[in-house]
């Protein structure tokens, strides 16, 4: 409870807009869409944001009196084609100058920056690390070099937001994305993302003397997509 950096924060007014002041529900209907336009420019997505929504009293309808049924806390979590949870068990983190006894984390969450870019945290830094913003790196998916109907490969451009960590790319980072249909459920598409990279960085938090690390390996994400559902955000089985 003392870690205020992990608290959900109220989404600033400049980052959203209601396209209409009211939501019209025809008689006999139980649900209706209420469009909200989000603006993520300048929003720090290292933090967790919520937008409270309340159904207000009005003489033209009867609201549900059950406690909590008129209020929702909308967790604002943008996504793009590359964001999500990646398995990081094939990404080894070594002390600089060593190839033995690597450190490994189970997962790495990629957050949205823009349509073709995500960010995550280097090495063993977790999403709830108190110093996580110091170790943020942006990963941009460049245009595919090779592309077929079911597969594409290309290069990654990776940059650190904080020069103090002395982030350096080693070699040429790449991505590979391919689709496979499920053998038992023919409507279900499996989309796999593999990111291959090697980089070095300094941990500047623990002491006055930085500790250097080298990370090498790959990250893997699988998305399951129901091809029978036309809306992309609804088709993904999160």
Predicted regions and their residues:
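Intrinsically disordered, low-complexity regulatory regions in eukaryotic proteins
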Residues: 2-24, 33-50, 56-238
């Amino acid at each position: 409870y003392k870690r205020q950096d992990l608290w959900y924060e109220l989404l600033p007014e400049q980052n959203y807009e209601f396209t209409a002041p009211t939501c019209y529900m025809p008689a006999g209907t139980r649900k209706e869409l209420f469009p909200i336009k989000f603006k993520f420019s300048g929003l720090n997505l290292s933090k967790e944001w919520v937008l409270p929504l309340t159904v207000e009293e009005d003489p033209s309808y009867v609201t549900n009196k059950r406690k909590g049924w008129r209020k929702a806390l909308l967790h604002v979590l943008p996504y793009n084609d590359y964001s999500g949870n990646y398995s990081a068990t094939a990404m080894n983190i070594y002390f600089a100058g060593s190839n033995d006894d690597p450190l490994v984390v189970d997962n790495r969450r990629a957050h949205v920056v823009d349509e073709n870019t995500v960010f995550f945290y280097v090495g063993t830094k977790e999403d709830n690390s108190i110093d996580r913003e110091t170790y943020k790196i942006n990963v941009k998916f460049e245009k595919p070099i090779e592309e077929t109907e079911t597969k594409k490969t290309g290069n990654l451009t990776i940059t650190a937001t904080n020069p103090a960590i002395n982030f350096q790319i080693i070699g040429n980072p790449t991505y590979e994305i391919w689709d496979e249909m499920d053998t038992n459920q023919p409507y279900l598409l499996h989309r796999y993302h593999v990111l291959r990279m090697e980089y070095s960085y300094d941990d500047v938090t623990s002491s006055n003397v930085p500790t250097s690390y080298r990370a090498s390996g790959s990250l893997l994400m699988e998305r399951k997509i129901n091809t029978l559902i036309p809306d992309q955000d609804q088709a993904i089985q999160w």
